[in-house]
Amino acid sequence: MSAVAENIQTEMPAPIVFTDSAAAKVADLIAEEGNPDLKLRVFVQGGGCSGFQYGFTFDEITNEDDTTMTKNGVSLLIDAMSYQYLVGAEIDYKEDLQGAQFVIKNPNATTTCGCGSSFSV
């Protein structure tokens, strides 16, 4: 009797969701800067009214411990410390009556401030 091994592949969801809307806005901002080497760096740092706050910046350098995601030709960088707080999060870009901003929906956050830019775990 022979055993047949089945090769079952399941597609794992991305640990962080980078929406089409966010990628499109980042692409627009990079085009405005005129530097195609720019990548969006998303990070978490201490501060804000809830203990931690999100930050966004452009970076040309990918560090050794960065997680890199690419969506529609746009690269997103997350450092190792921030990654642990962002696993499962969605990074989106919204335009509404309150203005235009990048928004992070983070299932790890137990509380968030009213503006959504700081959180606690």
UniProtKB/Swiss-Prot annotation:
List GO BP terms, alphabetically. Answer: iron-sulfur cluster assembly
Q: Name one Pfam family in it.
A: Fe-S_biosyn
InterPro entries assigned to the protein according to its UniProt record, in alphabetical order: FeS_biogenesis, FeS_cluster_insertion, FeS_cluster_insertion_CS, FeS_cluster_insertion_RrpA, HesB-like_dom_sf
UniProt xrefs under Gene3D superfamilies: HesB-like domain
Keywords from UniProt, A to Z, are: Iron, Iron-sulfur, Metal-binding
Keyword Iron-sulfur in the entry? The reply is yes
The residues that hold iron-sulfur cluster are C49, C113, C115
Coiled-coil annotation reads: none
Family matches, as PROSITE patterns: HESB
Q: How is the cofactor bound?
A: Binds 1 iron-sulfur cluster per subunit.
A GO molecular-function term, please? iron ion binding
Required co-factor(s) are: iron-sulfur cluster
Its function, per the record, reads: Required for insertion of 4Fe-4S clusters.
The similarity annotation says: Belongs to the HesB/IscA family.
Q: How does it assemble?
A: Homodimer.
Q: Any idea what this protein is called?
A: Putative iron-sulfur cluster insertion protein ErpA
Instruction: Record the organism.
Output: Paracidovorax citrulli (strain AAC00-1) (Acidovorax citrulli)
